[in-house]
Amino acid sequence: MLDICLLGTGGMMPLPYRRLTACMTRFNGHSLLIDCGEGTQVAIKERGWSVKPLDAICFTHFHADHVSGLPGLLLTLGNAERTEPLLIIGPRGVEKVVNSLRVIATELPFPIEFYELNEKEHVIQMDGYKIEAFHVKHNVPCYGYNVIIPRAGKFDPVKAKENEIPMKYWNRLQKGETVESEDGRVLTSNMILGEPRPGIKLTYCTDTRPVPAISEHAKNADLFICEGMYGEEGKEKKAREYKHMTFYEAAHLAKDADVKQMWLTHYSPSLVRAEEFMGKVKSIFPRAKAGKDGKTITLDFQEE
């Protein structure tokens, strides 16, 4: 199961009812944070979630509304006596940006490791899941992210016997381990399992124009969280000028990608009630919802 929470849905500046951009996931004792706007750690505490099992922080880009919550979060992790390394992923210059923000958090009891995004696509293998980063179109280097939990195929006893796999290795191979047998053979999970089954996929992108890379990478996502900076009529020119998206452009991306559902996020401060504009959005993509701070979902593997 993958737990997902929109911690903040605001763009540019926080409002009394809307914190700045951040999204958190939880899977099998591991947590991941995408962006860390002002108020992120307060939002985490409000949800009753914990920062302790945080594996990594993924930054889409380095505008202030996406990174301003980082120093306080790092200090909180330090005060919690964390010693495990923290991975921070982001576009070119990520180490320089983070170290600049750390001017008030210079001494931490844990090391920070950096993964710099400098290609159009990256795949980062984590413990039990993977992160895919893909380049999008903003006025600074910016990336969208997929969080993917793969699911192995079903155990196939006929295949196991055909490959002469001793029963004592079945359990370890089903867990994905590679085993050397007593006769020197290297045994792998594909020798006893069927074809991989559909896993769980979250796609997250914000601060971008609607480029083809988004719908390509969001294809068949279980949840597509996408920027909807403007819902009001007449904002199309502004969206093009500042490299953002309207609600309706996001809806077309969701339709093209055939995602299971879409949540809008990263609203302009001028947008007070996103729900008012959802009628037209749903006429394009019926499975769309207006995201709001604290909106949470648990995604599970599909029943077969």
Q: What are these regions, as identified by a protein language model?
A:
Residues 1-47, 85, 145-147, 194-205, ...:
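Conserved beta-strand hairpin/beta-sheet module of binuclear metal-dependent hydrolase folds
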